[in-house]
């Protein structure tokens, strides 16, 4: 049995690994290093193009639950993330290069996976999982459009945040802490007074943007919105978003500042930090000018400026089923952000499910029923739900799972913990069936 996987991002690598672990021969196509997209900086697989944070690692948060489900089902991406994690409070952040290099090493060393470099411009014959990502090349995008019909692809834009060196941060104007002192004090917090914020906001909202073809409609994904776009929504919008000071007391004053810019470690050495929530598409000189107005960053050395790029995704409901298979041709499945899931872990989960179910189909087995009560199942059911009127990329959340059916005392966190406990119970019940066909 043989399957072609197109794309060695998080979804494609997870899919290739799960297929290979089940004794299936995998040909993995990756256009790097021969060709790169504007968002790529390295030749390794599973490159984290935006943030190095995989978001919350607490099961009371839906993405934390999704991580735990994948861990229990032997996910490659989660194993590599856990092995390369860096301190980030209650979140799971990874050494960006270390994570990508480990995934690459695992994939390249698997005896059932053959990596073929170069661009794919047509959908191959046979069984295929297309995980070419939101920056799918024009040639392959045209082939996909021809296969599924015009009008089934949509676009939005997202952006990446800048990186600065730790040694260039003025720690006399910053302090280490995690919000509400939760976990370890892993974030560098850069406080701003009301006057400093006012000057920063004025500069940010009037700064010159880089030209991005097709961006005139300002169609951005809310979870990756450029900081300058968010700032224009209102004077204090940032203070309720990425610059919110709640739970962060400046040790110099004992008070919460007017606004706080947080920096998160980007590598294991702690030599590089990213500006949390500062996705942007300002021109590079403007990024240097405006972001240097943050007191702790007045002499910051920017090792990478923020960039913005177009993302492509499918109008999946009515086209894909809950297992990410093309309804019109079930030898083809899709995975990753192009299916309409948003986020690193969500992408890996889609690759996991697409591969597990393709392997079972090739073995003549019936699909494993991941119910809506699980995060993995809920995502598949969301992207295939034809009742969704305005389909847009979405992160996993408890809102796409059914309610408990009974009242829980103790607030939202306790309720979410109960939802997570229910989900993990379902996963544990499915684990034997999911892993039974592995040939390791």
Positions of predicted regions on the chain:
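Internal hydrophobic alpha-helix adjacent to the cofactor/substrate pocket in enzyme cavities
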Residues: 347-368
């Amino acid at each position: 049995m043989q399957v072609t996987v197109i794309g060695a991002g998080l979804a494609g690598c997870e899919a290739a690994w799960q297929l290979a672990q089940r004794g299936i021969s995998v040909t993995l196509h990756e256009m790097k290093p021969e060709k790169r997209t504007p968002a790529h900086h390295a030749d390794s697989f599973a490159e984290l193009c935006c943030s190095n944070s995989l978001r919350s690692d607490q099961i009371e948060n839906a993405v934390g639950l999704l991580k735990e489900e994948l861990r229990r089902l032997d996910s490659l991406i989660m194993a590599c993330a856990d092995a390369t994690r860096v301190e980030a409070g209650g979140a799971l952040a990874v050494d960006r290069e270390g994570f990508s290099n480990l995934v690459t090493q695992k994939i390249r060393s698997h005896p059932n996976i053959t990596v073929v470099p170069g661009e794919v411009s047509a959908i191959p014959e046979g069984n295929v999982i297309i995980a070419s990502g939101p920056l799918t090349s024009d040639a392959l995008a045209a082939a996909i459009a021809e296969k599924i019909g015009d009008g089934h692809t949509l676009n939005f834009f997202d952006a990446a945040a800048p990186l600065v060196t730790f040694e260039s941060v003025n720690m006399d104007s910053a302090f280490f802490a995690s919000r509400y002192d939760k976990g370890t004090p892993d974030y560098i917090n850069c406080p701003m007074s009301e006057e400093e914020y006012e000057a920063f906001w004025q500069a940010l909202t009037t700064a010159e943007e880089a030209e991005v073809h097709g961006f005139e409609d300002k169609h951005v994904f809310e979870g990756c919105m450029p900081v300058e776009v968010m700032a224009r929504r209102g004077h204090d919008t940032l203070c309720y978003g990425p610059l919110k000071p709640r739970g962060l007391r400046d040790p110099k004053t004992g008070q919460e500042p007017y606004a706080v810019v947080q920096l998160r470690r980007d590598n294991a050495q702690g030599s590089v930090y990213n500006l949390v929530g500062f996705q942007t598409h300002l021109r590079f000189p403007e990024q240097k000018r405006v972001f240097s107005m943050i007191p702790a960053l007045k002499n910051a050395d920017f090792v990478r400026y923020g960039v913005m790029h177009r993302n492509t995704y499918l109008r999946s409901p009515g086209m894909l089923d809950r297992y990410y298979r093309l309804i019109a041709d079930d030898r083809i499945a899709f995975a990753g952000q192009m299916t309409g899931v948003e986020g690193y872990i969500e992408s890996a989960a889609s690759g996991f499910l697409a591969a597990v179910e393709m392997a079972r189909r090739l073995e003549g087995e019936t699909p494993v029923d991941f119910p809506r009560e699980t995060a993995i199942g809920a995502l598949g059911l969301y992207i295939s739900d034809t009742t969704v009127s305005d389909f847009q990329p979405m992160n996993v959340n408890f809102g796409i799972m059914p309610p408990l059916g009974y009242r829980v005392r103790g607030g939202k966190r306790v309720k979410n913990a109960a939802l997570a406990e229910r989900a993990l119970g379902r996963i544990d019940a499915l684990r034997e069936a999911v892993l039974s066909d592995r040939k390791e």
